[in-house]
């Protein structure tokens, strides 16, 4: 079977995939970390698209996702998903993080996109433990692509080598890489 899940270390804004997933905050207006980097690289068109979404629905709730155009990014679209803030693991964080991945994947598939790149959602300023977040990400994506034809290719884009190795280990254990 052809490998459908890949680990890449680098800058998610440079990837030529159909969809880049943005680890957004509820306002969708950009912020720090990967959210800010995606907004800066995409230019004003992305902010305008996010403003339109906000006018239609208000804030994006935790675990939900919305899709917009990609502005100046090499991608065709951006899925903005809001992951949970880590509060010790007793506030349904695992389910909310799983929902963030699932709702992103559903939007990718519903719009017939074939490739998607995910950052490590919630592991920056939202302080989700990296190993636990990676386990949820790998399990959720693996289960989804087993049951769905799209997306054909999924990339976990890691900012540093340590996180990339974490994802690679998990995928090797599952036999997906």
Curated annotation (Swiss-Prot):
Q: One Pfam family from the UniProt entry?
A: Macro
- Where do the catalytic residues lie? 35 (proton acceptor)
Q: Give the record's keywords alphabetically.
A: Hydrolase
Q: Where does substrate bind?
A: 11-12, 25, 33-35, 122-126
Q: Which SUPFAM superfamilies match?
A: Macro domain-like
Any one Gene Ontology biological process term?
purine nucleoside metabolic process
Q: Which Gene3D superfamilies match?
A: Leucine Aminopeptidase, subunit E, domain 1
Q: How would you classify this enzyme at the top EC level?
A: hydrolase
* Macro domain sequence ranges: 1-175
Q: Write down the EC number.
A: 3.1.1.106
Instruction: List GO molecular-function terms, semicolon-separated.
Output: O-acetyl-ADP-ribose deacetylase activity; purine nucleoside binding; ribonuclease inhibitor activity
Enumerate the catalysed reactions.
3''-O-acetyl-ADP-D-ribose + H2O = ADP-D-ribose + acetate + H(+); 2''-O-acetyl-ADP-D-ribose + H2O = ADP-D-ribose + acetate + H(+)
Query: In this entry, which stretches build a coiled coil?
Result: none
For this protein, the record's NCBIfam families field holds: PRK00431.1-1 (NF001660), PRK00431.1-6 (NF001664)
Subunit structure, as described in the record: Homodimer. Interacts with RNase III.
Family membership: Belongs to the MacroD-type family. YmdB subfamily.
Question: What is known about what this protein does?
Answer: Deacetylates O-acetyl-ADP ribose to yield ADP-ribose and free acetate. Down-regulates ribonuclease 3 (RNase III) activity. Acts by interacting directly with the region of the ribonuclease that is required for dimerization/activation.
Q: What is this protein called?
A: O-acetyl-ADP-ribose deacetylase
Q: Which organism is it from?
A: Shigella flexneri serotype 5b (strain 8401)
């Amino acid at each position: 079977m052809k490998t459908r899940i890949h680990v890449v270390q680098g800058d998610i804004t440079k990837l030529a995939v159909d969809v880049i997933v943005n680890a957004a905050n509820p306002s969708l207006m950009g912020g720090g970390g990967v959210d800010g980097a995606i907004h800066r690289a995409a230019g004003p068109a992305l902010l305008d698209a996010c403003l339109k979404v906000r006018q239609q629905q208000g804030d994006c709730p935790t675990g939900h996702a919305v899709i917009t155009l990609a502005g100046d990014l090499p991608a065709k679209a951006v899925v903005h998903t809001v992951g949970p803030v880590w509060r010790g693991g007793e506030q349904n964080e695992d389910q909310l993080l799983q929902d963030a991945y699932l709702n992103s994947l559903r939007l990718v598939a519903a719009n017939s996109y074939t490739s998607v790149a995910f950052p490590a959602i919630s592991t920056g300023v939202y302080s989700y433990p990296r190993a636990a977040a990676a386990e949820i990400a790998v399990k959720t994506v693996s289960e989804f692509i087993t049951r769905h034809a799209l997306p054909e290719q999924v990339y976990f884009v890691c900012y540093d080598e340590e996180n990339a190795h974490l994802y690679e280990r998990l995928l090797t254990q599952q036999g997906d890489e």
